[in-house]
Amino acid sequence: MSTAALITLVRSGGNQVRRRVLLSSRLLQDDRRATPTCHSSTSEPRCSRFDPDGSGSPATWDNFGIWDNRIDEPILLPPSIKYGKPIPKISLENVGCASQIGKRKENEDRFDFAQLTDEVLYFAVYDGHGGPAAADFCHTHMEKCIMDLLPKEKNLETLLTLAFLEIDKAFSSHARLSADATLLTSGTTATVALLRDGIELVVASVGDSRAILCRKGKPMKLTIDHTPERKDEKERIKKCGGFVAWNSLGQPHVNGRLAMTRSIGDLDLKTSGVIAEPETKRIKAIQYGTEDNSTAVVVPFGAWGKYKNSEINFSFSRSFASSGRWA
């Protein structure tokens, strides 16, 4: 779809467009005739105020090169003009979240979501360990840290990397000034997703809280677990002076204590190679219609249990039947 056609559509009352807008240039060009009103209808096409090719034929969304006009969400007009195709607005009303304590005495998981600006949505999961202090700190301060960086840094992958490192540094200062010595061993995973303009999805993570994108019934991995099982992570830990030991269940741990190689917090393991620098991933997430729905799932490691990505994907796809659902 041409950008010029979209701009013309917006100027011609695009804010009233829903599923099908019909316009006619002949009526617009003839000043002697009365200006017709716009119609939003799924019935037979009517005359319209303009057409994209000057042929005088009634115009619909299909005339603008859109192969699927079954868009159920409101349209983000500025991003649609920018990218040259209609982009559905993702509302926070379509965001679902839940937390269950399971068999633990204390729930150390935290989650958050917010609309940071007109263009950017924020989603986050923090799975704490060694107490909830680090997860609570991220839950309280990460959103503001990202907000402060948004005007300065346009690259969202770089922005999230800076935010993770700043939060880790701030938590370190907070813990060392505190009289509570347990803060030195408190840590958390962090998986944060930013959605800009309804189309640019960027995910950053440390630890093993996974994020996947469910698309057409198939899972797309957005994160990779940071564990000593990864050869590159294991080698990095050793080069930093740490070691990997296996417990009675055959699970590798950094210095025999931590099951992940990257986290926010865990200050007592910083000199052993446990870092807060995230790995990031950026994709375009544009969808059309309910048949091509997209669901992003961000889940702490413990919630996955024995399930594989494909099984989690199937379960969530059945639960979120509408397009643009987020969890």
From Swiss-Prot:
Organelle transit peptide residues:
1-29
Which keywords appear in this protein's UniProt record, sorted alphabetically?
Hydrolase, Magnesium, Manganese, Metal-binding, Mitochondrion, Phosphoprotein, Protein phosphatase, Transit peptide
Q: What is this protein called?
A: Protein phosphatase Mn(2+)-dependent 1K
The catalytic activity, as recorded, is: O-phospho-L-seryl-[3-methyl-2-oxobutanoate dehydrogenase] + H2O = L-seryl-[3-methyl-2-oxobutanoate dehydrogenase] + phosphate; O-phospho-L-seryl-[protein] + H2O = L-seryl-[protein] + phosphate
What are its cofactors?
Answer: Mn(2+)
**Ranges for domain PPM-type phosphatase:** 94-327
Q: Which family does it belong to?
A: Belongs to the PP2C family.
GO annotations of cellular component type: mitochondrial matrix
Quaternary structure per UniProt? Monomer. Interacts with E1 and E2 components of the branched-chain alpha-ketoacid dehydrogenase (BCKDH) complex; this interaction requires colocalization in mitochondria. Interacts with BCKDHA but not with BCKDHB of the E1 component. Interacts with the 24-meric E2 core composed of DBT monomers with a 24:1 stoichiometry; the N-terminal region (residues 49-61) of PPM1K and C-terminal linker of the lipoyl domain of DBT (residues 145-160) are critical for this interaction, whereas the lipoyl prosthetic group is dispensable.
InterPro entries the UniProt entry points to: PP2C, PP2C_BS, PPM-type-like_dom_sf, PPM-type_phosphatase-like_dom
The Enzyme Commission number assigned here is: 3.1.3.16, 3.1.3.52
According to the record, the residues making up region (Critical for association with the BCKDH complex) are 46-61
Q: What is its main location?
A: mitochondrion
- Ligand binding (Mn(2+) 1): D127, G128
Cofactor binding mode, per the note?
Answer: Binds 2 Mn(2+) ions per subunit.
Q: Which gene encodes it?
A: PPM1K
Write down which residues bear the modification named Phosphoserine: S248
Could you state a single Gene Ontology molecular function term? Answer: metal ion binding
Disordered: region residues = 33-55
* Function, as annotated: Serine/threonine-protein phosphatase component of macronutrients metabolism. Forms a functional kinase and phosphatase pair with BCKDK, serving as a metabolic regulatory node that coordinates branched-chain amino acids (BCAAs) with glucose and lipid metabolism via two distinct phosphoprotein targets: mitochondrial BCKDHA subunit of the branched-chain alpha-ketoacid dehydrogenase (BCKDH) complex and cytosolic ACLY, a lipogenic enzyme of Krebs cycle.
Which Pfam families does UniProt cross-reference here?
Answer: PP2C
Q: In which pathway does it act?
A: Protein modification
Q: Which residues bind Mn(2+) 2?
A: D127, D292
Compartments annotated for it: namely:
Mitochondrion matrix
